[in-house]
C-alpha cells in the first residue's frame, strides 16, 4: 500500500521527503513552485461541499490549478471533484445519495475534458452503504477502465469501525476486483487493520495533525507528519497474493 501523508503547507513536502497529499486550497494563492517528490493533488471537496454546499467555481478552475502545479515534482494524480455522501453532508446540500453520485460522475466527465491528458484524473466512488458504492461502480460504467486507480470516498468517518470500511471496499471489489482503491482521510485504527489494508492500493491521512493538537504538540509541525508516515510504513503486512495484480 502506498501511503500519502497529508500536509498543511506545500513547502513542507521537501522536508517530509515522502509521498504526500496537498490540497488545492493550499495552492490557490501561491505563485511559486514548491519542491516535492511523489504527491497527490486533493480537490478540496470537503471544504466546498460540506461547508459551502457545493463547488463555488466551475471545473475549469480546478483543471487550471491541476495544470499549473503538475510540473512540481512527480504528480501521481489529481483527485476528481466528488460529492460526499455522509448524512451531515446530505443535510447541508438537501440532496440524496443518488443525486450526489450523479453529480460526482458529471463533475468527473467535465474535468476529463479540461484536465490535460498528461495528468491522471482519479475518479471517486461515492455512497454510504456498501450496496450504494456497488451501484456507483455500475453507474460509472466504461469510464472505469481495467485496473483503474480509483478513490473510495466518504469512508473517513468510519475509521473507528474498520469492519464498516472493509465492507465498503469489499463491495467495490466484488463489483470490480481489478480496481486499485484509494482511501481518503484514513486514520490509524483503519490503517492498522489488515482487513482494510489488503483491499487498498493507497491511502492518505492527516490524522497526525489532530493527534498532535490533542496531545498538546504543534499540529503544523512537518516532523509530526514525517513520524506519522514512518509509523504507517512500519505496519506493512505480509505481501498479499493480489498485490502483484493491483500493481500491474
Predicted segment positions?
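Alpha/beta catalytic cores of nucleotide-metabolism and tRNA/nucleoside-modifying enzymes
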Residues: 1-14, 79, 96, 113-114, ...
Amino acid at each position: 500500500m502506498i501511503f500519502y501523508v497529508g500536509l498543511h503547507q506545500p513547502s513542507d513536502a521537501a522536508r517530509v521527503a515522502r509521498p504526500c497529499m496537498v490540497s488545492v486550497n493550499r495552492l490557490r494563492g501561491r505563485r511559486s513552485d514548491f519542491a516535492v517528490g511523489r504527491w497527490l493533488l486533493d480537490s478540496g471537496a470537503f471544504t466546498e461541499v460540506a461547508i459551502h454546499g457545493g463547488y463555488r467555481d466551475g471545473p475549469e478552475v480546478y483543471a487550471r490549478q491541476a495544470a499549473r502545479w503538475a510540473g512540481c515534482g512527480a504528480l501521481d494524480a489529481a483527485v476528481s471533484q466528488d460529492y460526499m455522501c455522509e448524512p451531515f453532508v446530505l443535510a447541508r446540500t438537501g440532496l440524496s445519495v443518488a443525486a450526489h453520485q450523479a453529480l460526482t460522475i458529471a463533475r468527473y466527465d467535465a474535468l476529463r475534458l479540461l484536465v490535460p491528458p498528461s495528468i491522471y484524473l482519479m475518479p471517486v466512488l461515492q455512497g454510504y452503504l456498501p450496496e450504494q458504492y456497488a451501484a456507483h461502480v455500475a453507474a460509472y460504467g466504461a469510464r472505469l477502465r481495467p485496473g483503474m486507480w480509483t478513490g473510495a470516498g466518504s469512508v473517513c468517518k468510519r475509521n473507528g469501525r474498520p469492519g464498516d470500511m472493509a465492507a465498503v471496499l469489499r463491495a467495490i471489489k466484488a463489483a470490480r476486483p481489478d480496481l486499485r482503491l484509494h482511501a481518503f482521510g484514513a486514520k490509524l485504527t483503519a490503517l492498522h487493520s489488515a482487513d482494510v489494508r489488503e483491499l487498498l492500493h493507497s491511502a492518505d491521512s492527516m490524522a497526525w495533525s489532530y493527534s498532535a493538537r490533542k496531545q498538546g504538540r504543534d499540529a503544523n509541525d512537518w516532523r509530526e507528519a514525517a513520524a506519522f508516515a514512518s509509523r504507517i510504513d512500519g505496519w506493512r503486512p505480509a505481501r498479499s497474493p493480489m498485490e502483484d495484480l493491483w500493481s500491474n
